[in-house]
C-alpha cells in the first residue's frame, strides 16, 4: 500500500515507532501512527485486446488480403501490422475475418 503525505505529497515510508509502526515522511515532519491493521486491495481492470489495438475504429480503414479464416474458412481477412516488440524484430500482423457473421481475430 502506498500512502502520500498530506503536507508535501511525497510517498510515506513505514517505520517502527516506540509503541507502534507509523507512516512517516522523509521530507517534512509528518508522522501518522498505525493503530490498527491496514489493508486495502484494488484489482486493476485489465485492458481488452481491442483497447490495445485502437478499438473498433482501428479496423475501419484497413486493407484485406487472401488469408483464410481459421474459424470459418472465409477466404479473405482484414489485416494491420503493429510493432509490438523491439525495433529489430519483425512487426506483428493482426487479422480479422471479412465474414461479418464470424469476425474472428488472430495474429501471425
Curated annotation (Swiss-Prot):
Zn(2+) 1 binds at residues 5, 8, 25, 28. Zn(2+) 2 binds at residues 69, 72, 98, 102. A zinc finger (C4-type) spans 5-28. Gene3D superfamilies: 2.20.25.10. A motif (Hairpin) lies at residues 88-89. One of its GO terms (molecular function) is zinc ion binding. A zinc finger (TFIIS-type) spans 65-107. GO terms for biological process: defense response to virus; innate immune response; termination of RNA polymerase III transcription. Component of the RNA polymerase III complex consisting of 17 subunits: a ten-subunit horseshoe-shaped catalytic core composed of POLR3A/RPC1, POLR3B/RPC2, POLR1C/RPAC1, POLR1D/RPAC2, POLR3K/RPC10, POLR2E/RPABC1, POLR2F/RPABC2, POLR2H/RPABC3, POLR2K/RPABC4 and POLR2L/RPABC5; a mobile stalk composed of two subunits POLR3H/RPC8 and CRCP/RPC9, protruding from the core and functioning primarily in transcription initiation; and additional subunits homologous to general transcription factors of the RNA polymerase II machinery, POLR3C/RPC3-POLR3F/RPC6-POLR3G/RPC7 heterotrimer required for transcription initiation and POLR3D/RPC4-POLR3E/RPC5 heterodimer involved in both transcription initiation and termination. This is DNA-directed RNA polymerase III subunit RPC10. The gene is POLR3K.
Amino acid at each position: 500500500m502506498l500512502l502520500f503525505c498530506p503536507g508535501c505529497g511525497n510517498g510515506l515510508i513505514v517505520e517502527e515507532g516506540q509503541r507502534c509502526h507509523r507512516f512517516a515522511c522523509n521530507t517534512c515532519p509528518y508522522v501518522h501512527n498505525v493503530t490498527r491493521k491496514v489493508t486495502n486491495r484494488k484489482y486493476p481492470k485489465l485492458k481488452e485486446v481491442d483497447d490495445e489495438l485502437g478499438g473498433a475504429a482501428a479496423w475501419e480503414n484497413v486493407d484485406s488480403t487472401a488469408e483464410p479464416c481459421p474459424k470459418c474458412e472465409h477466404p479473405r481477412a482484414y489485416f494491420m501490422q503493429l510493432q509490438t516488440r523491439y525495433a529489430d524484430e519483425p512487426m506483428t500482423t493482426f487479422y480479422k475475418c471479412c465474414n461479418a457473421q464470424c469476425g474472428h481475430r488472430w495474429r501471425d
